[in-house]
From Swiss-Prot:
Residues 25-78 are extracellular. It comes from Dictyostelium discoideum. Glycans are attached at N37, N38. One of its GO terms (cellular component) is membrane. This is Putative uncharacterized transmembrane protein DDB_G0283807. Its main location: membrane.
């Protein structure tokens, strides 16, 4: 169980760091767009300001903000694809760990549970050997059952 917790925490740390990387690329993209807007002249800024207001109104009226250029759309698709891949990998690791844990538990249950009694133990318990029956001894003696 400790190994399962460690694997889960490791996957969680990877996911958080990945999401931080995605967030930082979005911030960098926004900064690049702002730098491009700042390089225009003052008359262009006024015209751009009116256009930006219209774009903002349109953007808020719809649920999805359209990308500004082809590169940002491509970058967004790459981020979405890598996020889906990461979560698919996490789900795969969780499934494999659950299956391995189940197999190990099953292996423990099916281990040889029989105690082989020597002649002295058999005489002490007064047991008749019969494959289909259960054999019991006193509390201080050995105990074995056929399952």
């Amino acid at each position: 169980m400790k190994i399962f917790k460690k694997v889960f925490l490791f996957i969680l740390m990877i996911t958080i760091s990945f999401l931080n990387i995605v967030k930082s690329t979005e911030i960098d993209e926004n900064n690049n767009n702002n730098n491009n807007n700042n390089s225009t002249s003052s008359s262009e800024k006024i015209i751009k300001g009116k256009e930006d207001e219209e774009e903002l109104k349109n953007a808020f009226s719809s649920s999805v903000i359209p990308p500004t250029d082809h590169n940002s759309e491509l970058r967004r698709k790459k981020v979405i694809a890598s996020t889906i891949t990461l979560f698919a990998f996490i789900i795969l690791v969780l499934i494999v760990s659950i299956v391995v844990r189940h197999v190990l538990k099953k292996k423990k249950r099916t281990k040889n549970n029989f105690i082989f009694l020597d002649d002295q133990s058999l005489n002490d318990c007064n047991i008749e050997l019969n494959v289909s029956s259960e054999y019991f001894c006193d509390e201080n003696k050995l105990l074995t059952t056929h399952e």
